[in-house]
Structures are given as structure tokens and as C-alpha cells.
UniProtKB/Swiss-Prot annotation:
Pfam families: CTE_SPB4, CTT_SPB4, DEAD, Helicase_C. Keywords: ATP-binding, Coiled coil, Helicase, Hydrolase, Nucleotide-binding, Nucleus, Ribosome biogenesis, RNA-binding, rRNA processing. This is ATP-dependent rRNA helicase spb4. The lineage of its organism: Eukaryota, Fungi, Dikarya, Ascomycota, Taphrinomycotina. Component of pre-60S ribosomal complexes. Residues 521-601 form a coiled coil. SUPFAM superfamilies: P-loop containing nucleoside triphosphate hydrolases.
Amino acid sequence: MSFQSINIDKWLKNAVAAQGFKKMTPVQANAIPLFLKNKDLVVEAVTGSGKTLAYLLPCFDKVTRRDTDETGLGALIVAPTRELATQIFNVTKELLAYQPDSLDGGKKLVADMYIGGKGTLTNDLASFREKNPSVVIGTPGRLNEMLSHISSKHLEILILDEADTLIDMGFQRTLQSIISQLPKQRRTGLFSATMNDTVSSFLKIAGLRNSVRVSVTVTSKKIDTRTPSSLAIQSLVIPPIYKVQCMIHLLCTIEYEKAIVFFSSCASVEYFNSLFLTYKLPFEIVALHGQQVQSNRSRNFEKFKKSNKKTVLFTTDIASRGLDIPNVDFVLQLDPPLDPKSFSHRCGRAGRAGRAGVAIVLLNDGREEEYEELLRVRKVPITRIDTPIEALDLSRLKVLTHELRKIVSKDRDLYDKGLRAFVSHVRAYTKHHASFIFRIKDLDLGQLATAYALLHLPKMPELKDTEISENIFKKFDIDYATIPYRDQVREQARRRRLEVEKTEPKKLARPAKIKNEAWSKQKEVKEKRNTRREKRKSKKEFLKAQKNEASNNLKQEIVSKAGAQETENDDLIDEESDALSELEEDYRQLKKSKKRKNQASFGFSM
């Protein structure tokens, strides 16, 4: 189905044609005609399927055709991240550039973007009043603030892009506040790559009671999947001691224009970006994560997007959803995502719009290998790379590890960042939603520390009762106090602190425990300890009883309320249980799959 066959304004058809789009994707062919017929839509489609144009074209067409006396805000588009909002705004500007100088009724469209972390609310309100935009794109927090100061009575369309991410990131209450400030007589479009129970329960709150559902999946060899057929998803099982070095091996040997590497924490992104900038690899590295200041985030995102040479983006899940970055051929997940739902979104940064792509996830050998079956249960087709470990040239990987540790031993900034990255990775590992697969007690922390090129192990609770063999992790032979900062200002400040510590007396330490203390004294201390323990226990039981009573009162209050308010509060209470039920169902399906495999291996018939 071509864009020329749909009933939209001529200038929009010209704009799409000028961008090189001739035929609509399946999601566009299904969604656009329904939107033009004033239907509320709930659209589920795989990443890279053209969802942005599927809502922008109807938005522009409807706002253009408004009555002449209706001016001001006509369409509101909400995105979960600043990067996605910026991307939508850029596409919007490209399309609106094809507007003729004068439209029927003189209603030329103006678009603007408002996101957090960039300017103040006062500046954004001034910009809104000056430009009087008919199409507004932004992130939930800033849009919610602005709506209490501007008029939205002529709003025609509300779009929630990447709706599941909006909810997963904790924006549900903010979205409710936004929706409560908008006119009820509007069209609403909810677009998402996945449709889980939490999103489904949010539909009524969003005013989508009689919506039309559009679900576009990829069918390949009679198997429905949630990823593009042009994307090859693979796993590589490897001991954690070689994980980081294997990442470098893959980035240096696989053919690609642009690649994205996903880490589990911002600290890991910072550390490995700094480390490999020093190591000088044969490609450019750009870092992007949520703890960067907005100016750096925007600059780095644009740098990676516009790069015309071999470039790798080190990032977190901030770049896993919705972003359309051209020429990304390869996605590597050093760490699987904490939420299994994010896996397909990460992979989907490659293989967009029919372009061939490869996505590889590195799994630790052992229990993590079950992650492959969990993904298949979730309709993500994944195949294992059967490359033997020996083929990776282990001697070269060991040399690389030693070289990285030597670099760290000469730069205190890297030394500090490495320890923070290791700690943050271990703590993130304990927060995996699929905890029946990712268990901290099964993770070889000594091997992981070696892969991170640490000089010594940090002090942390997870290592308290763990014995690390010197064959696995050996401390680097150096006086850690002598490691300097490359930045002379920081190094001089550090040395001044050391001098002060030497000259000033140390703070009085807690008195050491007397081992041969009198028995009567020990008994008295023990009795006091037991008394305190009983008090804490009583207080805990009292608070628990109060919490249960408050919960029961809340449930009774919710039951007594009617209509939409009842549904709204019920959904908020059940949100966590929905997510838990989904994971429990995954676990049951995983056990069934393993059972069928075991029976098949012993020749039993089902």
C-alpha cells in the first residue's frame, strides 16, 4: 500500500516522497487509515517498524484540518527519554519543512519540543507563548509542569510513544496528571513494542475504553517473533574472566559501520569508555548514559548519530528504546538487561527498516545458559555461536588483560572508576528480574574482577565470605597509594590530603573489644542486646500491623469508589503483582521447556 493512496493532505504526501518512502510498512498501513477515521489506537509492533510516521502523518493532517477558530496546541506527543523526544522532533521538523507558504485557512503548523534538563520551565513557557506551537513533543515531567500554565482546550490528539517504557520508568502518575489536564473529546494513540499486563491495565486510565488494537508481528517459517526477520540474534557462552576481552575481540573483527555495546550500569560505561580511549582501539568510542549532564548527552548522541566512520556507542538501557540511529549493524550486550523485556529492544537498534543486523549477547557459562530458553519462551529467536573458547586465542586475551591492568596502574582516575564499575555491576546483578537464572552466588567474582582489569578486590558485602583463588585473581604488585592522577590539579590536591593525614592525629577509633572480659560483664551486655532485639521485633510487628490495617482500609476505600477512579486505583495497587505474575509465568514455561527436552533426550514420547 502506497502513501499516495491514503487520504492525507497533498503536502504531506510530497514530504514523505521526498524522504524516499514509497510504500507503507505493515504498521503504517494498518494504523494510519484507522487514525484518520477518528479511532483511538493501541498499536503493538516490533522495533524499527515505522511507528513514528504511523502517528505523525495523521497528527499533522488532523491538526491542519481544524476549524479556523481553533488555534494553539493541537497535538501532544509524549516520549520516555530526551533522546527519543529529540529524534521525534527532528523527524517532525523535516516533514514540516515541506509545508507550502500558505495553507487553507492559514493554519500553518508549528512544532516545538520541551524536555527536562534543558533550560528552565520559565524559558519553555516563554518559548511556547512566543511560538504558539500546534504540535508539542516532550518528556512527561516537563510537559506535566507546562500544562498547568497553558491552554489545551483545542487539543485534538494525544500520542504516548513507547508506552511500556513510560510506565516501566515510573511515569504512570505523571501520565495520569497529564491526561487529567486534557480535553476528554480527543483522539489517543498508544504505541509500544510490547503490550504487557501493566500497559493493558493503563488503557482505561488513558481514556482508551473503545480503542482499536493493531498488533504487527513478524512471521518467519510459521513462527511468530517479536523481532525483525532481518536481525540475527545470537549468544556466546564464555567464562566471565574473558568477557571484556572477548567484547574487544568481537568489536575488532566483526564488519559494521556503527555498533552499540550495552552495559548494566552508568559506572561501567564511564570506566570502559575511559579505559579504551587510553588503549587506543581501531574505532571511535562514544559514551551515553543517564548520569551525564544533558549537554554532554545531547552532544554525544548527535556525534554518534552523525559519525561517518567506524564508531561504537557504549551505553545503558537509555538507548535501548525507540531511537532510530542510521547504519547500526551490530549490537553487543556485555551484560543482559535486568528486565528480560528490554532484550528485544536492545537488539532492535540493529536491523531496522529491513536492514540486515547482528545482535550478540555474552553469557557466563553455567546457569546463565538457561537465559537462551527464557528468550525463546518470550518469542525471541536466538541461536548459540558454537565457536570453541580456544578459537578466541586465549593467550592474546590474557596479554590484553595484563596490558589493561598496566594502564590502570598508571592512572588513579581509571583505578577509582574500575572499582566503582565493578561494585555497580555486582549490585545490578542482584537486581535481575529473572533471579531464578541470574544468582549472585553462581557468579564467579574473581573471574569478573580479572575481566574488569582490577588491581585488587574492593571491600563489599558480596565478597565478605568469598574465597578467591590466586589462580583466578591475583593482586597487581604495586603500592596503590602511589598511583597518581593524570590531571595535575587533582594529583596535587590528593598529595596535600595525604600530607594533612600524616601530620594530624587520627580520629579516636572505637575501643577494641576485650577478649577476656569478665563473664558477668558479657552476660550483662548480652541481656541488653536481647532487650534491644525484642524492642525492634515488637516495633516491626506493630508497624506491620499498621501497614496491613492501612492496606485493608485503602482496599475498602477503593472498592467503595465507582467507575474510572476504582479502576485507576486498582491498577496502581496491582501493578507490581502483574509484573511478578508475568515473570512467574516465564519461569513455569521455562521449566516445562526443560522438562520436554529431558524427556526427548531419554526417548520418552509426550
